[in-house]
Amino acid sequence: MSVSVHENRKSRASSGSINIYLFHKSSYADSVLTHLNLLRQQRLFTDVLLHAGNRTFPCHRAVLAACSRYFEAMFSGGLKESQDSEVNFDNSIHPEVLELLLDYAYSSRVIINEENAESLLEAGDMLEFQDIRDACAEFLEKNLHPTNCLGMLLLSDAHQCTKLYELSWRMCLSNFQTIRKNEDFLQLPQDMVVQLLSSEELETEDERLVYESAMNWISYDLKKRYCYLPELLQTVRLALLPAIYLMENVAMEELITKQRKSKEIVEEAIRCKLKILQNDGVVTSLCARPRKTGHALFLLGGQTFMCDKLYLVDQKAKEIIPKADIPSPRKEFSACAIGCKVYITGGRGSENGVSKDVWVYDTLHEEWSKAAPMLVARFGHGSAELKHCLYVVGGHTAATGCLPASPSVSLKQVEQYDPTTNKWTMVAPLREGVSNAAVVSAKLKLFAFGGTSVSHDKLPKVQCYDQCENRWTVPATCPQPWRYTAAAVLGNQIFIMGGDTEFSACSAYKFNSETYQWTKVGDVTAKRMSCHAVASGNKLYVVGGYFGIQRCKTLDCYDPTLDVWNSITTVPYSLIPTAFVSTWKHLPS
Amino acid sequence: MSVSVHETRKSRSSTGSMNISVFHKASHPDCVLAHLNTLRKHCMFTDVTLWAGDRAFPCHRAVLAASSRYFEAMFSHGLRESRDDTVNFQDNLHPEVLELLLDFAYSSRIVINEENAESLLEAGDMLQFHDVRDAAAEFLEKNLSPSNCLGMMVLSDAHQCRRLYEFSCRMSLVHFETVRQSEDFNSLSRDTLLDLISRDELETEDERVVFEAILQWVKHDLEQRKVHLPLLLRNVRLALLPSDCLKKAVSGEALLMADECTKLIIDEAFRCKTKILLNDGVVTSPFARPRKAGHTLLILGGQTFMCDKIYQVDHKAKEIIPKADLPSPRKEFSASAIGCKVYVTGGRGSENGVSKDVWVYDTVHEEWSKAAPMLIARFGHGSAELENCLYVVGGHTSLAGIFPASPSVSLKQVEKYDPGDNKWTMVAPMRDGVSNAAVVSAKLKLFVFGGTSIHRDMVSKVQCFDPSDNRWTIKAECPQPWRYTAAAVLGSQIFIMGGDTEYTAASAYRFDCETNQWTRIGDMTAKRMSCHAVASGNKLYVVGGYFGTQRCKTLDCYDPTSDTWNCITSVPYSLIPTAFVSTWKHLPA
């Protein structure tokens, strides 16, 4: 076929209609790559030798450059290697690993196993085979466990594997007692140790373990690490240590006594500890703030809906243990925790009178006291802690209340209690008065979900209070009209479940308090109206409630990472829970 | 990551359970190919330059070798080009075409249009890009037309595109009268021309068209081509030329008389023609064999089921014209054609007596004569021509027959008539006696489909007679039990349609007599029991039949290439077809 013949065909064809056919052979690229691999195996047209260890791999520059930016840059720049016909990795890459990478480059397939996954991830990142690096990270994610999670944390941090890093980090927090004994722990960089030990989510009930881990890390390389001691000491919740341990072991530690700043930190912690022991006001110092697993869960309830007793949930033994009687039994009250104290507000007593009373139970000293009464007598209201103050929201009142209100109509009034001054103050009222709403605080704001409105309907609104502006807004609508629901907070996520709704009473949702977005989560295991929920550690706990004539008999736990509910224990037959709170936990002094 | 670290990981992992993941990135080959294309466009890592015309194309040897065996061989095995860094196609390849091929090699995609398809086919074949060659062939198949089919035939023959060759050859045959006038015709090779003119399927009713075409071809390059004249003439159906045309050839065409071989051929053809004109025995010379388009379709029928007239189908005018009366009207007879004669055998006359008579109608001389009577009087039998002899198969007889047989029971007997000596001979009987069966000959064998058995059931067997063995075998089962069906033959394919069957009487099937395989084809436009079919040209024709009380009023045509049925014409109201034959056609002498 000559050039002139083709020109004739062009001129002839042009007189006809335009007829075009795009031919694409989807298997063509696979075929070319397979052929290139055969050429490589036969050492045909290869123009570069890669050396690793004592092995040599002949390759095609163009193919390597097409697969990896590392090689493209190496061969195309003014670098020495761009001219050389050999590249030597010496001992920085194992020949078995390089072989796997090259097999992948020429076949698009690679076998990843426990022996090679970490090395492949490193080499894949180094040579910019990002697909390999990501595939190995995924493999390691599926094979993550407490004995290797610390190593994976270091590996993923070094190679920008975000998801593997997140999963490893979470597993390290959950398995602190295991990883602290790991040799890798002692080799962690300083910033990572600080981040780990200071985390709220670090799962330990014995703060002594955290102190000892910090001291071990310092001692491992005392010469270089001694200067970091003050920073590490601040990660330990020193005021939560047993008093004797704090006085004798920590205060007397030679490494601490010889360093002025560390000594000051310990002395501050001792003063804080004494304040706790003497019950002298509210202790809000960071060194006394328990980690999430240091929370104690308390149920309030009784044999009827009249609440007369306080119970402790023993998570280890999976038991519910009576702790104290309530001085003044009541129903339709609200309960909230600040620090290690439980505040019980309002409700109705044995003669159905609406109460202004506020009782306070000190979980540390196991004793009751009375706080200043509320400004408005309430029942069916909600309450939450915000910046160490107690807020009481909505509910019903009676004609005898101090402020004017219609009998049995949902209140708009919101009042604030400051424990340090033992005083109540009115703050901005709700946009819409509600009772039987779910009230929580998250990210320095109060949220009220649903409830019963002044016209006795179920309200489908989310109402939000900003303390800085002293103002309520309505930033979102609930997925459905709601009342008698339960809510609890994990980070910026508010979980709402159960309740009286047009949909199933076992449905549960997640609300992002920053984006105001709703997400459905897994259903509660039973239908629960008037149930109660708290968050502790990285989990949610729900108890109580009923549906029809059936009482819900279990205490259930929800794990957000798995989106599953499990039963923790059975509620005693004689107990009807009417409130559920989480307080700071302290070890016996 | 060092070698020792990897070794440590291997030994550590081995203690655990074996856990393997095969990572496969399906898009990796496409990514690599796209990157290679980018490298090519930037002239990076290129190690060979292809030249075509005045354009240069830098490429990667490895990629070209992986894409094409032509380049793999060129660059390997010590050839000169294996060391040169340039390859020059000069004017053998148009640069636009080479560019398209290289784009395909590096992207798996190519745009094919009317301007480039032929050149791509040629270059794709030359450089062994067979996918491109095949894709271009497919494009050309879809754009085949009478004005280009001859050129495509030449092109596809040169480049082993078998399917395009078949399609273009078929189109050239169907449109011979058009293609012989094209410029390409004179450029055909001798073998290609022979292939065309030797085929029965060449569609012309006037053999002078073929005769003049080959003279034209020879004269186009007289010195080189006159040596081929004898062979070409042997493939023209010279005896079908009008007598005056033959005489003119003898006296007027100097070219034909100049060569002794050619003269002999003309003389032989003339003697054959004379024999036909004098009606001196059966003429079976290839010179007298009509092309399929030269067949005459004849319908036998009458105003009732008693047949008393022969009609001719005029294709051009789409009419059915009476031609002659039958000397002895009859029903339940059978009719077959040998050459230009129609043989009417057996049946029952006006007094229901079963007949042995054989009447012969000569379509050239338009006259009846009587042949020797059959050995057995029959009705409801089948007949077919095989190797210029007439075979009569099965049917019913009566006690008056020469051979013993039960009254009205289906016959096994088969007898053969040789027109050469005007004698009947018994041949091997069928395995199962049948009547009302479809009987045809194909590939030198007789085939009998279904029929009524001696138990009066419908038969579902295909029985086959091989005259060289004088033996019947059962080749296959019919798709369903059958009788009163029609059958016709195209090449090795036997088409069977209609009839009395458990399924629809409109169904039609194709049987491959070489592989014994059945295939369902498109249904007829009407249900037809006792219909009749013939093949002519590349098409099937069916006429007659009834369903319930409804007569089928049309003559329909089936085109196997499009698997569709169409109506040709209506059968006159006064005509009930009872037989349908196809004879050789001769022009008026």
From Swiss-Prot, chain B:
UniProt xrefs under Pfam families: BACK (PF07707), Beta-prop_ATRN-LZTR1 (PF24981), BTB (PF00651)
Pathway: Protein modification; protein ubiquitination
CDD domains the record matches: BTB_POZ_KLHL25
Entry-linked PROSITE patterns: BTB (PS50097)
Repeat region (Kelch), residues: 296-340, 341-388, 389-444, 446-492, 493-538, 539-585
GO biological process: negative regulation of fatty acid biosynthetic process; positive regulation of CD4-positive, CD25-positive, alpha-beta regulatory T cell differentiation; positive regulation of fatty acid oxidation; protein ubiquitination; regulation of translational initiation; ubiquitin-dependent protein catabolic process
Gene3D superfamilies in the cross-refs: 1.25.40.420, Kelch-type beta propeller (2.120.10.80), Potassium Channel Kv1.1, Chain A (3.30.710.10)
Domain BTB: 46-114
Keywords: Kelch repeat, Repeat, Translation regulation, Ubl conjugation pathway
GO molecular function: ubiquitin-like ligase-substrate adaptor activity
Subunit organization: Component of the BCR(KLHL25) E3 ubiquitin ligase complex, at least composed of CUL3, KLHL25 and RBX1.
Free-text function comment from the UniProt entry: Substrate-specific adapter of a BCR (BTB-CUL3-RBX1) E3 ubiquitin ligase complex involved in various processes, such as translation homeostasis and lipid synthesis. The BCR(KLHL25) ubiquitin ligase complex acts by mediating ubiquitination of hypophosphorylated EIF4EBP1 (4E-BP1): ubiquitination and subsequent degradation of hypophosphorylated EIF4EBP1 (4E-BP1) probably serves as a homeostatic mechanism to maintain translation and prevent eIF4E inhibition when eIF4E levels are low. The BCR(KLHL25) complex does not target EIF4EBP1 (4E-BP1) when it is hyperphosphorylated or associated with eIF4E.
Protein name, per record: Kelch-like protein 25
